């Protein structure tokens, strides 16, 4: 089985990316092949916090690669920072490059991080998007705060909260269960 975690932050090395990396480790315990597509590292649009603007050819290549990875995935995880009480425009832009054919009847997990007030609102908004794309948003979701993470000596963030580590295990187990027991396989 293949999975794809889409990180919708404009910042390289974001908390959302750290959560995605933690989840890859959890998916590994189920022998699943899971990739991270970090929109900060492979932009599909012009917003870039690094101060560089990717060329149109690079953007076109990234879009094609993104579409192929989404289509090939058996499940998706959408990750977003909390931007003004909702999901990021970068993630919205990425989702605008796919349609129902890419997501139809696939399990979709939702994860997010807030630097300020902890909020699951961005994930609630994404549930509507997943439903519109005919995907199946799994019930368990993860909404973390910057304080749930610590930094290694090299500055790399990692999830350092036992409660969220337990929730991450439940989240992954639930997605795996949906993938392995889908009654909708014939509808794809």
From Swiss-Prot:
The keyword Plastid does not apply. It comes from the Bacteria. Its cofactor is FMN. One of its GO terms (cellular component) is cytosol. One of its GO terms (molecular function) is FMN binding. Gene3D superfamilies: 3.40.50.360. It holds the Pfam family FMN_red. Keywords: Flavoprotein, FMN, NADP, Oxidoreductase. Its EC number is 1.7.-.-. Homotetramer. Catalyzes the reductive cleavage of azo bond in aromatic azo compounds to the corresponding amines. Requires NADPH, but not NADH, as an electron donor for its activity. Belongs to the azoreductase type 2 family. This is FMN-dependent NADPH-azoreductase. The lineage of its organism: Bacteria, Bacillati, Bacillota, Bacilli, Bacillales. The gene is azo1.
């Amino acid at each position: 089985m293949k999975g794809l975690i889409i990180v919708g932050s404009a910042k390289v090395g974001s908390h959302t990316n750290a959560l995605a990396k933690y989840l890859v480790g959890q998916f590994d315990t189920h022998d699943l092949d899971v990739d991270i597509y970090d929109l900060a590292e492979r932009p599909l649009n012009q917003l870039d916090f690094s101060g560089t603007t990717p060329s149109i050819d690079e953007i076109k290549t990234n879009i094609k690669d993104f579409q192929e990875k989404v289509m090939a995935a058996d499940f998706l995880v959408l990750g977003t920072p909390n931007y003004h009480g909702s999901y990021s425009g970068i993630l919205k832009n990425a989702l605008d490059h796919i349609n129902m054919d890419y997501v139809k009847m696939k399990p979709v997990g939702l994860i997010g991080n807030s630097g300020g007030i902890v909020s699951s609102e961005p994930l609630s908004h994404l549930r509507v998007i997943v439903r519109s794309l005919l995907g199946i948003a799994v019930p368990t979701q993860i909404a973390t705060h910057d304080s749930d993470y610590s930094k290694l000596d090299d500055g790399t963030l990692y999830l350092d909260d036992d409660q969220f580590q337990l929730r991450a295990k439940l989240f992954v187990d639930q997605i795996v269960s949906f993938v392995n027991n889908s009654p909708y396989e014939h509808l794809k």
